[in-house]
Amino acid sequence: MKKSYVSAVALTAAAALVLSGCSAGGDEASVESTTIKVAYQKFGAFIQVDNHMKAMKEAFEAENEGLTVELVPIEGQENDYATKLALMNQSPATAPDVMYEDTFRVQSDSDAGYLAPLDEYTEGWSDWDSFYDNAKSAGLGSDGLTYGIPMGTDTRAIWYNKDLFAQAGLEVPFDPQTWEDVLDAAATIKAEIPDVMPLNVYSGKAQGEAASMQGFEMLLYGTSDSLYDADDQKWMTGSDGFVDSLGFIEDVYQGDLGPTPEQALDKNVGNLVLGEWLPQGELAMAVDGSWISGTWLETGTAPWPEWNDVMGQAAMPTQTGDAPGATSMSGGWTLAMGSGAQNKDAAWEFIALALNKDNAQSYDIAASQIAVRSDVSEDADYQAANPTFGFFSEIVKFTHFRPATSDYAQISSAITVAMESVMTGQQSPEEAAAVYDDTVIGIIGEDGTASVK
């Protein structure tokens, strides 16, 4: 059930925004502006944030006569968006007042001075009590201050086509206990329905965080190893789990169980997965996120009324079935305030409006997000809106989060390099892992790493 975009807070008549001085004339720096600049990602099938921001612009301007919200949708896949946003933030003339910020970049961007702390606002915001504590922590900087207000979170699992599984003689519901079960199912699909692509796992440099987090880390955290020792604050090298995770990628791509490397390295492969391969029955399994059904809703870019009848979900198993038996990865996005915002009160009021109870719920439903507000997650309309919400919320107990460090982005990039070298057959998993280890030591230094061997 769609909820209307209605403000639950009486917005103050915000004072006029002040333009950053960027011209040679000294008087220009003091010219008042009535515009709030809001930057966010818009790419392919991912239109939900764009729709939400358009609705929030209309609501904010209706309640704040004389103020204008300038929307700056940035076209680009996740890494491209981050690069373009960073370029905007480097100049006062282009830096946004409000920005759509990935939780894993909050620390690095706040350390870089791009973001403004929000604690003085959250302390007086009654809605803040409705946000789960672990969601709040996702918006913290390395200094312990709040820089981002969470919009929603997510988990990841295996989406599978029940009709194709039945056609291949595989049991439905699918309940893999080990990696081998997943690969065996893919091999069966290949043998029984050769025209169907068995399995997609995002991999390679072009996919950025979708590859490193959604592909590789979904595997690694199903082993006994991890990327980072949070207690000792050291990045791990020399782990068997790292090599084995690359081995899974090798099995998929060198074993013809997934897309060709050329297909997988296309920046638009995510749009193909959601808009064509899954709806058209060309792909049997995809390791993907809880949000993807939003593409198939009536409000999405590729409506597919039968999606819930056709698609099933299975938790990603641990490597050999060891406890807890399954694994997942969680992330999420926030709304953050630019450190250079000249009217921070107005920027905050936009954030508070966009993420109040009704508007957060409307966005979470449209974008198939796991709610981070208790009053949304407990709402009957939210619970009834998507038949997968229960499954994806249940696997939160198995989930893991990316290391919350300012240098994670560089490590993530090194992971995608290792994945690409293996998927294209240029290196063995052992060789690629060794190169990764050397790269991490080069980035962090010997003192910031530890070998498990």
Feature-to-residue mapping (PLM):
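Hinge/lid segment of periplasmic solute-binding proteins
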Residues: T103-T155, S212, G312-A315, D381
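Conserved C-terminal helix/tail region of periplasmic/extracytoplasmic solute-binding proteins
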Residues: A166, V172, A191, Q254, ...
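Extracytoplasmic/periplasmic substrate-recognition and gating elements
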Residues: A168, Q254-P259, T299-A367
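Conserved N-terminal structural module of periplasmic/extracytoplasmic solute-binding proteins
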Residues: K3-A15, L19-A112, W125, S362, ...
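Glycine-centered hinge/linker elements that transmit conformational signals in sensory
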Residues: D184-A187, D231-K267, G312, M316-Q319
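Extracytoplasmic/periplasmic solute-binding protein
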Residues: L145-M151, R156, D181-G241, L274
